[in-house]
Amino acid sequence: MKVARFQKIPNGENETMIPVLTSKKASELPVSEVASILQADLQNGLNKCEVSHRRAFHGWNEFDISEDEPLWKKYISQFKNPLIMLLLASAVISVLMHQFDDAVSITVAILIVVTVAFVQEYRSEKSLEELSKLVPPECHCVREGKLEHTLARDLVPGDTVCLSVGDRVPADLRLFEAVDLSIDESSLTGETTPCSKVTAPQPAATNGDLASRSNIAFMGTLVRCGKAKGVVIGTGENSEFGEVFKMMQAEEAPKTPLQKSMDLLGKQLSFYSFGIIGIIMLVGWLLGKDILEMFTISVSLAVAAIPEGLPIVVTVTLALGVMRMVKKRAIVKKLPIVETLGCCNVICSDKTGTLTKNEMTVTHIFTSDGLHAEVTGVGYNQFGEVIVDGDVVHGFYNPAVSRIVEAGCVCNDAVIRNNTLMGKPTEGALIALAMKMGLDGLQQDYIRKAEYPFSSEQKWMAVKCVHRTQQDRPEICFMKGAYEQVIKYCTTYQSKGQTLTLTQQQRDVYQQEKARMGSAGLRVLALASGPELGQLTFLGLVGIIDPPRTGVKEAVTTLIASGVSIKMITGDSQETAVAIASRLGLYSKTSQSVSGEEIDAMDVQQLSQIVPKVAVFYRASPRHKMKIIKSLQKNGSVVAMTGDGVNDAVALKAADIGVAMGQTGTDVCKEAADMILVDDDFQTIMSAIEEGKGIYNNIKNFVRFQLSTSIAALTLISLATLMNFPNPLNAMQILWINIIMDGPPAQSLGVEPVDKDVIRKPPRNWKDSILTKNLILKILVSSIIIVCGTLFVFWRELRDNVITPRDTTMTFTCFVFFDMFNALSSRSQTKSVFEIGLCSNRMFCYAVLGSIMGQLLVIYFPPLQKVFQTESLSILDLLFLLGLTSSVCIVAEIIKKVERSREKIQKHVSSTSSSFLEV
């Protein structure tokens, strides 16, 4: 086995040694020796020059995915379509029968059809590739003595990486610091129980397999508990995960329910189309028509009538919609979620950072002896003052206040550097408070001996320390957390410099003050200190404000009005939670609030009975989210659930739409989620729901257009054959219609701008088919108008009973113009084209103009006239056709107008009856 290797990279006059170290060897060596081999500075990290030199040799910390098959092969594969092969056979037969004009025409048409299909498929693949790049993994590493937030792909061997709960390990690391560290290695070893990690060297005899290397954190594994630091020993394919990656190239993504239904619809239409086409061939042959001509037309009709492009365009529309959502700060990781967004009727949202800004500022202090202090200033900086009875407090001037500040500063993992917070906002607020009093240096005065990390279950954090200058004295514990939890560990309280026994009367005083601060919308933290966790002295309370995000109240109002119920989940007290919810318009007189303890006391059945009326879940933890989701889903709700912590991952997977926070969310949480809010803003959820509804509407518009064209083409040829008319369209003309049907005009319907009124529509029932009765009726009406209009033109031109190029040109152009007007009316199912704006969808305008220009070339350009067997038409002919074909759009607009009028009448009757009942 390879142990270590070195490569010289020229660097001017000097040469840099680039090492590679295996995880087995690194686990056996002391940390100091590993650092020496890697030429790494564990505390200060590498400098930029060293990083660039090492990357020159090792490359980026990512995997090389084998190149896809070349484009020419993908293009050739399009010819494997059975219908295309039949057309090619038709062209070959034409050559053998010396019908060279037909052979050339069919070949040109085949090339155009194949090219359009290839471009569609390539575009679909590229759109999906873009989706996979939306969430690049990130990490924290130390470089040049500073902690940096960087992309995981930037790491090189020798980098120092910091890990915390919820992180995905970005490379193979030899750990040199570990506090209560537990890592889930199931993705690598298959072992579901998290592995405890240490820093001591492992004897060679005991580290044969990966699971036994307890001082190595492997790339791709997940930190479940604790925190650590490690030095990078392997990146990319030189990591242990690199070997696994070679065996687990990504499988093809499963299709979305909508794609599956479109596949099924396509197969059903194909079945019916082949049946009808078979009858057309048989009847044509019995009527004595040319068998080769009938065969070519039938195959061309199959190409046009069978909507093979339906699933591809659906995929492209979904993918392009997802890319539009990115601009609105929402990253959708899985295409099915785009469909689900339009069905969402319940949003369960965390309060902190989603409904509120997550910009914590301490505004009030209450000491254990009843002293009140007001705090000024905002942000993570030293600008502001602590004021007691009108006097500014600084340093240790007021011991009761300074002891609270000391506890909050020492029992803290946050760092504020250059007014930038690195850590949790709540802890940042406590550091900023210490900075205002000039006590932020207290963090460095203590040496930690033990740590009890915060968890959403226990709702407190504690550290055991000794003073740096008094290490011979007993250790002291500092604790901060929810008042109800911290007070359990307290036996005494401070009053005017004295330590007194904590009585029930004193507890009641603190409880009342906590309730008063909470009802003002403040997040309340309790602080304590003492020799042991069970013998702490209560120091007091701090009130932290977290203002609501701008625009959230308006978003909440809009969503509730559209039929989406919103429920707030928070770890705060009832008073704080209800105060914030009321301010946001979430909580009304008829609303209920339920605590985490009450959720524990109920089963899913009991909770499902009251959950529709509950607007606030307070003192709730991630484990309660699972029960809330199940109770809502039991009632038939489609639930979106937000989360940011490791323990939220299970709930996010169980929800119909799991929503992770982009800024505060852990890697585990982001991986479990279906959607990531880049800015952690609740408004972004509303924008995503709006976009989801809009995308679904666009797909309905596209389906309406394509199916009406398919049905019209089939019906036209069928009726002409059964009525013993000459064929109104030849094979090349039918294939041209197919290009329009599957090409740019159709695809441009998928990118129609979202109608702003769509957010006010109620959520869609997820059981509803995309082909509603109303949509089927509109498809049939459009098809009938197109068929009748085209047959009328054909009959009108055929009155001399002799079919000429002019006859087919008029019929062909009539069908194409009908198609363009049909596409125009399909842009919206409810609004007039003038309401949405003729030019609001530029891509549609370009597509229609391009199709019309193409049609004019087919009519007037001699080489194409020969291919499509057309002849020039007069201006009067074109004006006549434009007037006739506009009828499909006019009728569609009349239907929309009637539907809107009927809807207004129903609303008026409904409001009148409700007013009557109230009276």
Curated annotation (Swiss-Prot):
Effect upon mutating Q747A: Increases manganese transporter activity
Reactions performed catalytically: Ca(2+)(in) + ATP + H2O = Ca(2+)(out) + ADP + phosphate + H(+); Mn(2+)(in) + ATP + H2O = Mn(2+)(out) + ADP + phosphate + H(+)
Catalytic residues in the record: D350 (4-aspartylphosphate intermediate)
Residue runs in coiled coils: none
CDD domains per UniProt: P-type_ATPase_SPCA
GO biological process: actin cytoskeleton organization; calcium ion transmembrane transport; calcium ion transport; calcium-dependent cell-cell adhesion via plasma membrane cell adhesion molecules; epidermis development; Golgi calcium ion homeostasis; Golgi calcium ion transport; intracellular calcium ion homeostasis
EC number assigned by the record: 7.2.2.10
One Pfam family, short name: Cation_ATPase_N
Parts of the chain that traverse the membrane: 71-91, 105-123, 263-282, 295-312, 700-719, 730-750, 771-793, 809-828, 842-860, 876-896
Tissue specificity statement from the Swiss-Prot or TrEMBL entry: Found in most tissues except colon, thymus, spleen and leukocytes. Expressed in keratinocytes (at protein level).
Residues that coordinate or bind Ca(2+): V303, A304, I306, E308, N738, D742
Signal peptide boundaries: none
Cytoplasmic side: 1-70, 124-262, 313-699, 751-770, 829-841, 897-919
Highest taxon of the lineage: Eukaryota
Impact reported for D350A: Impairs pump activity
Effect of L341P: In HHD; decreases protein expression
Effect of I580V: In HHD; impairs phosphoenzyme dephosphorylation
One Gene Ontology term of the molecular function aspect: ATP hydrolysis activity
Membrane topology type: Multi-pass membrane protein
Connected disease: Hailey-Hailey disease: An autosomal dominant cutaneous disorder characterized by erythema, skin blisters and erosions, and suprabasal acantholysis. Blisters and erosions most often affect the neck, armpits, skin folds, groin and genitals.
Listed NCBIfam families: ATPase-IIA2_Ca (TIGR01522), ATPase_P-type (TIGR01494)
Subunit structure: Monomer. Homodimer.
Function of the molecule: ATP-driven pump that supplies the Golgi apparatus with Ca(2+) and Mn(2+) ions, both essential cofactors for processing and trafficking of newly synthesized proteins in the secretory pathway. Within a catalytic cycle, acquires Ca(2+) or Mn(2+) ions on the cytoplasmic side of the membrane and delivers them to the lumenal side. The transfer of ions across the membrane is coupled to ATP hydrolysis and is associated with a transient phosphorylation that shifts the pump conformation from inward-facing to outward-facing state.
Protein name: Calcium-transporting ATPase type 2C member 1
Organism: Homo sapiens
